[in-house]
């Protein structure tokens, strides 16, 4: 798989998905990474610590199929340090090549098959006005436990 995306768009998507990446990986090193795969509208980045999963889509031009898991922190640092412009990421068997302008590097990838499978929620979604949600959270947060 290969995709092209604007640096700022990719950096924003990484920042959101990275919030769910496990800080301690324990027995599953794949949880320290982001799964990247093509989607209908571009590229999908998924981060998970098995309790929280965040999926983000970023507009991009994609070629090919497949997915891979890149080390989240390292990938984020690389993308943030790039000059603004188009970033090209190409995945081969066990590496991701990142190119932007004259910059080129490669990262080792992990198998996407080891990444946890996500189950889609069943039933219809719910819409809540932002103000109502904010007010509800403001009322219950003081009672929430700080130990968990």
Residue ranges and their predicted role:
Residues 1-148:
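Structural preference for solvent-exposed beta-strand-turn elements
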């Amino acid at each position: 798989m290969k995709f092209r995306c604007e640096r700022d768009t990719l950096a924003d998507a990484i920042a959101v998905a990275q919030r769910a990446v496990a800080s301690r990986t324990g027995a599953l090193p794949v949880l320290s990474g982001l799964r990247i795969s093509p989607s209908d509208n571009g590229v999908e980045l998924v981060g998970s610590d098995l309790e929280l999963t965040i999926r983000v889509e970023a507009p991009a031009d994609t070629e090919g199929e497949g997915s891979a898991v890149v080390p989240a922190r390292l990938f984020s640092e690389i993308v943030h340090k790039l000059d603004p412009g188009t970033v090209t990421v190409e995945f081969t068997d066990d590496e991701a090549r990142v190119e932007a302008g004259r910059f080129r590097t490669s990262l080792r990838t992990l198998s996407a098959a080891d990444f946890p499978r996500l189950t889609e929620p069943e039933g219809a979604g719910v819409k809540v006005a932002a103000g109502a949600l904010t007010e509800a959270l403001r009322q219950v947060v003081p009672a929430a436990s700080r130990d968990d």
